């Protein structure tokens, strides 16, 4: 097939990387990009364009932003584009069956895991939070179920010990772009052969809840480290510092270092400053905080926070917990 007509659907930077790659492919044309409506963001709550909308604008691709596909007019608009393929990556909206039936060939989805593992909204974050050593990318044909469709291509990718969700989004976006180009070539040449998922091996990567952003210091230090990595850069791993006679300080903790060091205090105790880091007692072991961000401030070294807030105080300095006191 020559001149494949492609409609792209996606929202964040992960998807924008894939859009740019597909738009540069010489086997077809991206005739439209669908992305979520502009959302209020930042302190001023100004409407913010998605990364896909910005990329599409740079590429001269028409943009559509329906709130959903419940209205007949939105479905008819998509059908009028006569797509051969839908390419979907982190769109964030559920697509009803009548939308999935529109393309001449397939609705293809880029999913940031080795399906059937980590179906759902947060596969990359969950893999890092769970301490997995390997994750990957899957190209699948979309169906009405959530990430349940048959698979076309997969690629495994190693999660390095220093990786965060942020670094893995970047790595997997590039792998996803390369894999999608391979999938489009297979479709255009009539070589697309899909393999069903084994539902018995599936699990669900639900969206990160607000309560999960708060660090539970009673967990073992390595587990805490994985959770912090998986929440970095967004939404961030958070805690409150309580100090006798002082107002609580809300902190966002950056990835530091889990230490195999028995803590002589209760979990959450901010024990002392040592070797450039603040040591926190955990349920098992000790966590060394090397960088953090107090509410309303920029991210700083733990040593700078110590010099500005804790120096001169007797150790232990206070207690970290998920609740403001």
Indicate residue ranges for each PLM-predicted region.
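Amphipathic, non-transmembrane alpha-helical secondary structure
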Residues: 16, 20-24, 76-79, 97, ...
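Internal anion-binding site segments
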Residues: 199-325
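N-terminal Rossmann-like dinucleotide-binding module
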Residues: 1-43
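A generic structural signal for well-ordered alpha-helical segments
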Residues: 55-56, 132, 232
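N-terminal glycine-/serine-/threonine-rich beta1-alpha1-beta2 phosphate-ribose binding loop
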Residues: 26, 40-84
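Donor/substrate-binding cores of folate-linked one-carbon enzymes
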Residues: 36, 85-211
């Amino acid at each position: 097939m020559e001149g494949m007509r492609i409609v792209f659907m996606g929202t964040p930077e992960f998807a924008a990387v894939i859009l740019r790659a597909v738009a540069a492919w010489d086997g077809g044309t991206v005739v439209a990009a669908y992305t979520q409506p502009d959302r209020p963001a930042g302190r001023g709550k100004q409407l913010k364009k998605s990364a896909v909308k910005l990329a599409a604008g740079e590429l001269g691709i028409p943009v559509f932003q329906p709130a959903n596909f419940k209205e007949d007019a939105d479905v008819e608009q998509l059908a009028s584009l006569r797509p051969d393929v839908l390419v979907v990556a982190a769109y964030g909206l559920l697509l009803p069956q009548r939308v999935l039936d529109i393309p001449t060939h397939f609705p293809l989805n880029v999913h940031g895991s080795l399906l059937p593992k980590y179906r759902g909204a947060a596969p990359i974050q969950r893999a890092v939070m769970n301490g997995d050593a390997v994750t990957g990318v899957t190209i699948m044909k979309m169906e009405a179920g959530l990430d349940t469709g048959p698979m076309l291509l997969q690629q495994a990718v190693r999660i390095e010990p220093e990786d965060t969700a942020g670094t893995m989004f970047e790595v997997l976006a590039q792998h996803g772009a390369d894999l999608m180009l391979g999938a489009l070539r297979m479709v255009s040449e009539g070589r697309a052969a899909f393999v069903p998922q084994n539902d018995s091996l599936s699990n669900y990567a639900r969206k990160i809840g607000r309560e999960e952003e708060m660090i539970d210091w009673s967990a073992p230090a390595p587990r805490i480290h994985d959770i912090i990595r998986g929440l970095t850069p967004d939404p961030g791993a958070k805690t409150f510092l309580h100090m006798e006679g002082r107002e609580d300080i809300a902190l966002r903790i950056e990835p530091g270092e889990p230490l195999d060091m028995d803590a002589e205090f209760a979990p959450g105790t901010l024990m002392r400053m040592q070797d450039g880091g603040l040591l926190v007692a955990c349920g098992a072991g000790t966590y060394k905080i090397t960088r953090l961000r107090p509410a309303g401030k920029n991210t700083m070294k733990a040593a700078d926070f110590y010099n500005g807030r804790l120096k001169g105080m007797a150790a232990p300095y206070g207690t970290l917990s998920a609740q403001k006191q």
